[in-house]
Amino acid sequence: MNIRPSQIKHKQRIASFITHAVVVVMGVLIVSVLFQSYQISSRLMAQEGQRTSVQTSSLIQSLFDFRLAALRIHQDSTAKNASLINALVSRDSSRLDEFFSSVDELELSNAPDLRFISSHDNILWDDGNASFYGIAQQELNKLIRRVAISGNWHLVQTPSEGKSVHILMRRSSLIEAGTGQVVGYLYVGIVLNDNFALLENIRSGSNSENLVLAVDTTPLVSTLKGNEPYSLDYVVHSAKDAMRDSFIVGQTFLEVESVPTYLCVYSIQTNQNVLTLRDNFYFWMAFALISMIGVSIASRWWLQKRIQREIETLMNYTHKLMDLDTKSEFIGSKIYEFDYFGRTLEQSFRRLANKEKQFEDLFNFALSPTMLWNTSGRLIRMNPSAQIQFLREDAQNHFLFEILERQLLPTITNAAQGNNPSDVTTEVDGRVYRWNLSPIMVEGQIISIITQGQDITTIAEAEKQSQAARREAEESARVRAEFLAKMSHELRTPLNGVLGVSQLLKRTPLNDEQREHVAVLCSSGEHLLAVLNDILDFSRLEQGKFRIQKNEFRLKELVCAIDRIYRPLCNEKGLELVVNSNITTAAIVRSDQIRINQILFNLLNNAIKFTHQGSIRVELQLIEGDPLAQLVIQVVDTGIGIREQDLTVIFEPFMQAESTTTREYGGSGLGLTIVHSLVEMLSGQLHVSSEYGIGTRFEIQLPIELVEKPDAPQQLLPAPDPQPLFDKTLRVLLVEDNHTNAFIAQAFCRKYGLDVSWVTDGLQAIEELKIHDYDLVLMDNQLPYLDGVETTRTIKKVLHLPVVVYACTADGLEETRQAFFHAGAEYVLVKPLKEQTLHKALEHFKHHHGQKNAGLN
């Protein structure tokens, strides 16, 4: 068996790999240990150096403070001596000289560098050392003023023969014991420049090799003798480095009376211990490296000798396997890993041979037609099932395989190029096959493609029948929608007359019996209109044409509408209406106001309908949240209630809890269905609980966008007074083919003082507008000759007449509404026409088109 050439050119034996691994592991461990030791040692050395430096600095400061304290005590005791006071009072300079000479002889170590006595502003006596340091008399007078602040030590700087002299000075008062008067001031000073004795005294007590006293980097005095391996300039400019240098340079800024100064003491200490530790570390690192090399050489020799024979045994067995001698057995190895590897290899090749036989059997005995193709689209082999089905001719003497090949070849070629293959459906000799394509890849390259077919003739026929049924269902839904639209128009047209005439009759003088008849007429018409609206809303929901339109509105309007509309209805039935709300007048929200009203009104209508005594309670709570607030609506009644088993069906269309409920209370059974759908469209939640004979509770939670509240709450505008809106008579053209609807519309318009002209079709309307000027056109939709939408488009976009068009449609569909707007209409009214609806439309006309009519209020 030919072995594929390896891509790796340079190869090594396993002994070399193991040796390298051992060397690498040992090297990493040794280097890690050495590195860790180095880090720990460096950290310890740095900490030790820092500790030593801190101790040295503290010791230097303590010695410096001790020296100043000794001078302070000596000065204060001298200032209290009676002999000194008497000599000063008598102004006897010789006695003063003798006194201080005797004092210095007794305590020479505490003698200051210079000493003088002054009054408040003049020098009375000095020891003459000032001239020794080159300090002039007038400079001493300046020092008196600079040190006259307190009895503390002062660091002062004074000129002396072209250079600066830094002096520590202190003043003590000389007080006569008999009178208590201050007769003078004793000044003592320590000159820091070239004060070797002071610095040597500090060095001897600080365990330092040398000290340098400097102002910043300018040396004042040092203990260096000149034979050191470092210079004075290097000391004041060097940095601490315990691993590089043989000495450590510390830096201490002196404090005088706990006040930081610019005086700096550089201390030099030996660093020999650290250097010795570093040298030992380097030695052991070199020793570890040499040891690692020796261990590596010995390991390689031992591994080469120990495992060479075992490796040769394993290699010989692999050569046999490559020659397809799958029956040979591995004799075993003394090394566990090699033995396990050889036996695993033996087992793997046996499994591979078994799988090849199983695959061959599966290919040959599969009932599904299976074929193997190369990347050029040429057939390599096919199984017996494919041979039986395609290696024959049809009734027209066409070779079936050639027909199949033409249909499969484009997809096979596409799959051979690396594209994801998709299932292919072919039809051969009246049979439909679905083919699954699977590329066979070796080392990332596609070498062949296997196709497996499935006879889906029966499934294809079922799919065709399913598609036909779907088309029939869609057509049925479309026909039903058209029927509902036509029914809406046909029902709304007579309903417009019923409601319009009943509203007109309400405003005429009537006796009680007639008023009751008119009320029954209005109630019946409103009930029929509500049923019609429910059916149309359900149709739009079912077709997915119901849309949520969000706008900003004052939420308090919802509470006011409940009280205004439903309190009279509850009073008529003797029910108590309780409305509780935390909604303020200032709360402005953004949502679909119409749909929220529709949800609440449907629930209240049901509550009033099914409640005969007791109360109806409405709870409205606005709960602020982030990012959306929650509007919680609860409607609780004491009505007939719902049985538990019926709670699952009340939201189904055209369903009520019981069949007797429909007969007794009426209704379409769509109210709760519409409520449930609207709540879902508003992303809300609906919960219902009920106890039969006790009452029902509905709770709705709606997410709602809370607009930022204004600074001050605004009062709701009162309902408009139904009075004439215009100072002059507006000319209105009514386009309506139905005489009843035209009569109702004209009657309503005349109540507002409008001059109405009536035409019955779109062509007449166009001709009328060409001849006369009108302020407003009320346009019906379904007109003879030319419908309302086309008539509006001709008026607005063809003739460009400057007249306002308000559409009046009876179907109430969103498609009709949008069609009118696209044609150019400014407003759409839905029949049956009501006085309140017309009033709202005229208000819209007044506010949006008033600039064209000077006669508007």
Swiss-Prot record:
4-aspartylphosphate modified-residue sites: 780
EC number: 2.7.13.3, 3.1.3.-
Entry keyword annotation includes Coiled coil: no
Main location: membrane
Phosphohistidine modifications at: 489
One CC-aspect GO term: plasma membrane
Span of domain Histidine kinase: 486-706
Record GO terms (molecular function): ATP binding; phosphoprotein phosphatase activity; phosphorelay sensor kinase activity
Any single Pfam family the record assigns to this protein: LuxQ-periplasm
Membrane topology: Multi-pass membrane protein
Protein name per the record: Autoinducer 2 sensor kinase/phosphatase LuxQ
